[in-house]
Amino acid sequence: MKVLVISDIHANIRALDTILREEADYDLLCCAGDFTDYGISPREVRERFRQLKNTVLVYGNHDRHVINIYESGEWTNVADGKYKWVHYNCERLSEKDIDWMKQLPEKAYFEADGWSYGIAHQYDNGYGTVESRYAFDQYWNASYGAECDGKRRLIFGHTHRQCIHTLGEGMEWINPGSISYRRPDDANRAAGFYVLFW
């Protein structure tokens, strides 16, 4: 089985389509949110995900921000010098697109390859990371319940920084990075994603 793990598309349909072509034989696609904002193709990205099968998707902070700005209507009358990517994205999205994002969960759980997985866009309200087994257990139990006693992996996006962090036997968290936009201090300009095989 092959699981494709991605995050932080930010309305970049070219990057998304490139990854989907390269990894077309995936069995399950997991996306840790941020489908919108900063890019030019929010509707196309939303439509692509609607067409895909076998997905586990959660919303990200930028998706929530786009929803809030869209529903407030403030994107329809933006003062000079205040126009941002969020307004650009709102202009290109329909009520149907917004409804699709609104139905995405904040967190999701699934099982694959003998592991239990929890997926969310971000670990905390900032750019924090899971630093200890205790913090991992606290987060897992609060988010997914304490009854899982086997191998567990958490998937986060948000930071645009790719990593795999092993806290001990059967306890890992991963961040695929962003398929679209790297942080300015990251010399690696390649798209970030992970492929899990078993």
Residue locations for each model-derived region?
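Beta-strand-turn-beta hairpins that frame and shape the catalytic cleft
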Residues: 1-4, 109-118, 168-172
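Core catalytic region of metal-dependent phosphoesterases/phosphodiesterases
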Residues: 2-102
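Histidine-centered catalytic micro-motifs
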Residues: 7-9, 119-124, 152-162
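Glycine-rich phosphate-binding loop signature in dinucleotide/nucleotide-binding domains
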Residues: 22-26, 52, 112-113, 147-150, ...
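Short, well-ordered alpha-helix to beta-strand connector turns
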Residues: 26, 52-53, 104, 151, ...
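Hydrophobic/aromatic beta-strand patches that form the interior of the parallel beta-sheet core
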Residues: 30, 56-58, 118, 155, ...
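Active-site-proximal segments of metal-dependent phosphoesterases and phosphodiesterases across multiple
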Residues: 76-80, 114-149
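Conserved beta-sheet core of the metallophosphoesterase superfamily
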Residues: 134-198
